[in-house]
Every structure is written in C-alpha cells, then in structure tokens.
C-alpha cells in the first residue's frame, strides 16, 4: 500500500496553514489489568500502515508547495518489552509509513505549538481532524487536544475533515481490492466447511467453530462477531448468542466475514441444516435471492444506497402481496426492517456519508433479507459488490447461493 501517496492526496484537499492530527487509539481495560484487544483507528492506519497504540500522525501544510509530515511514537522500553512486547522503533515506523521525521509523543504539543507560532506569523492556522469518528479514543484525545490549543490561542480554527477522508477511503485502489478478494476467498472456504459439517441437532456455536478454524488456518481475523442463527433465531437481525441447537428442517443463517490485512469481507448465506429446503423455505428464499440479483443489476456510479434499498422495498411489496403476506395490518417493514447495503473496507460498516452517490471503486454490501418470525424462517443473502465504470462486479460470486447448488453441495457430505 502506498501510504505516502494517500497522505499527499489528503494534503491536496486541505487548506493552507493547516495542521492535521490523527491518533491511533489505545485499548481500554476490560477488568483489572486485562485489556481488550487493540483495534487501531482505521483512518490512522489508512494513512500510515501502522497498527500500534498511542501514536500520532501530524501533517502540516503551509502552501501547495510546502508541507511536512511527522509521526510521534512512544519511546522503546526494554523492561516493558519483556512483559508485553516492545513499542515500535524509529526505523520500523519509518520503513512501514515512509515518514522520515519520527518523534516522541512527549514533544507532541510543544512541536505543534512551534509550527503555529513560529511559522504561522500573521496567518491563522486551521486544526484538522476526523472529528465525526465514533471511536471514543479518537474523539476524546484529538478533540481535547484541539480544545487545549484553541484555549491557548483563540485565533485557531478547527476543521472536521471527515468528508475528505471518506472520499479517499471510499474509492478503493487495486491493492485494496485484491486484499478484499482474499478476505472473501477465505470466507468462502469457511462457509463451505460449515455447510459440509451441518446436520440436525448440531449446536450453532459448533457450526461457528468450523468457520473460526478456517480463519485461524488462513492467518485471518474475524471482520466482526459471527452470527450463526438457526430457526427462529435467524429472525433476530444481530443475534449473537450462537448457543442453540438446530432442529430438523431448520434453516441456518450465517452472517460472517474474514478480515485480511484489516480489510473486511461481509457475507451472509442461508442454508438448510439437513441439506434440503422445504417448499415454503424455497418460496421465501427465491424472493430474497431475486432481490439480491435486482440490487446487483442496479448498482452503479451515481446511485445512493437509499435508492437501492427503496427498490428492494418496492420489489418486496409486489412479491409479498402475491403470496398473501401483506394486508391492511402487515407491511413490508414487518418482514424486512434493515437497509440493503453499507460501505465495506477497513471497517465492516465502513466510513460513509448518508446520501452520498456511489463512485467507481466503492465496495458495498448487497444484503436483502426476509424474516417470518411466526414461521421460524429468517433468510438473508449477502454479497460484496465493487462499483465499476458503469455497473458493479460481484466479488463474492464464487460463494454458492442458488438453491440447487446448495443442496447438491451439502448432500455430497451426507
């Protein structure tokens, strides 16, 4: 990944006399001296390639021709390295990020003030940050830093550069697309392993374990917490207990994904635990599958995610009426209450702006579903789409989803 080029593109979008600060984040404590696993701020990672705690990226733009960049790291501690592993060293940080100017976090505020007061002269600096981020560490640390600076110098302005970062991150380059393809390929293998080992009376978390094992073998992480829901549990959108056993004739809804080099895949497949769909299951599944294909045919530059979702609702209105599921009381939203798509990338629900049109290079999900709680049927079919010049490419097309293909595959192992 060309992190330097990404920083250059961001700097081109920023005002003169601006200082941009990004923070990598820090893992909070869960209980006692035990920490949650660290998850780097994805925008910090996007511009540096470094996945370490408590680092700062600082970009300074004085003019179109004059800018500089600095990375602030923690000093290496030999004693702590023996207990929890070493902090990143200057040479390693320089090699990964291509940032030559490596400094220590202890000098962060003083160094920024130096640029403001020595170089700003009569110009008022603008402090730029990704201030719409939901990560608590990012919002608290950078916002508080800016608050302190403005208190010390009220002439400073603050600019939220969430949109600029979104524009860059939403348009995936070829390297990013290939990494996402890899994540999807591993997800495919995991789903097929689940299908091959599915049987009635199997526990949901036992099926889930086959996916977990696949990820471990392929040196991948989970993109998000796996949903492995059987029967009525599949009508709960974000079901996560995964601790019930599957009865004969149950469907299994598995919403899961591998993460490779931090890039997520997000796939959902629904299959019969015993390898055979009932006629009613086939009827509902076919409607969802056709909705999935409708979105794939429609997705292209210029459309919004809301337009794709509205098309699915209109399609369901006609199809559900035809099979008697809609009346004066029941509406489509009684059977389908989520959106059909979200952005995908370094985050499973990747950085996005509501109503922003799709552009070439965006990767989105395509996940229509129907949930008939009274019948114990929950079906969702989710694929990952790459927006191209005039349409889209289904990156997950190799993962089977036709009824006949699923039954044929599963019954090889019965």
For the regions a protein language model found, what residue spans apply to each?
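Active-site neighborhoods and metal-handling regions in enzymes and metal-associated proteins
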Residues: 1-414
């Amino acid at each position: 990944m060309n992190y330097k080029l990404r920083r250059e593109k961001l700097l081109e979008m920023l005002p003169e006399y601006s200082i941009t600060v990004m923070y990598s984040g820090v893992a909070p404590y869960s209980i006692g001296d035990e920490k949650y696993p660290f998850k780097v701020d994805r925008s910090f990672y996007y511009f540096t390639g470094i996945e370490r705690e408590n680092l700062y990226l600082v970009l300074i733009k004085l003019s179109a021709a004059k800018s500089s960049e600095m990375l602030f790291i923690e000093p290496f501690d030999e004693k702590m390295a023996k207990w929890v592993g070493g902090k990143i060293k200057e040479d390693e940080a320089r090699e990964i990020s291509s940032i030559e100017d490596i400094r220590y976090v202890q000098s962060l505020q003083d160094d920024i003030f130096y640029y403001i007061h020595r170089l700003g002269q009569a110009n008022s600096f603008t402090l730029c940050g990704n201030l719409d981020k939901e990560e608590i560490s990012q919002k608290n640390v950078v916002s508080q830093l800016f608050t302190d600076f403005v208190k010390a110098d009220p002439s400073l302005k603050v600019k939220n550069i969430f949109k600029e970062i979104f524009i860059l991150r939403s348009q995936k380059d070829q390297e990013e697309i290939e990494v996402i393809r890899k994540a999807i390929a591993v997800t495919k293998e995991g789903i097929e392993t689940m299908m091959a080992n599915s049987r009635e009376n199997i526990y949901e978390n036992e099926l889930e374990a086959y996916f977990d094992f696949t990820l471990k073998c392929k040196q991948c992480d989970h993109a998000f917490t796996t949903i492995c829901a059987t029967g009525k549990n599949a009508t709960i959108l974000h079901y996560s207990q995964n601790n019930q056993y599957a009865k004969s004739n149950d469907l299994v809804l598995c919403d899961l994904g591998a993460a490779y080099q931090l890039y997520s895949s997000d796939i959902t497949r629904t299959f019969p635990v015993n390898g055979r769909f009932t006629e009613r299951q086939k009827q509902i599944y076919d409607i969802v599958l056709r909705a999935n294909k409708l979105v794939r045919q429609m997705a292209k530059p210029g459309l919004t995610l809301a337009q794709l979702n509205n098309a699915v609702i209109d399609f369901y209105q006609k199809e559900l009426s035809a099979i008697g599921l809609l009346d004066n009381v029941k509406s489509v939203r009684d059977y389908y209450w989520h959106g059909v798509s979200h952005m995908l990338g370094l985050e499973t629900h990747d950085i996005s702006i509501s109503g922003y049109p799709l552009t070439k290079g965006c990767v989105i999900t395509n996940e229509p579903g129907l949930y008939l709680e009274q019948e114990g049927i929950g079906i969702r079919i989710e694929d990952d789409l790459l927006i191209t010049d005039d349409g889209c490419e289904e990156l997950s097309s190799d993962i089977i989803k036709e009824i006949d293909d699923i039954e044929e595959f599963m019954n090889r192992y019965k």
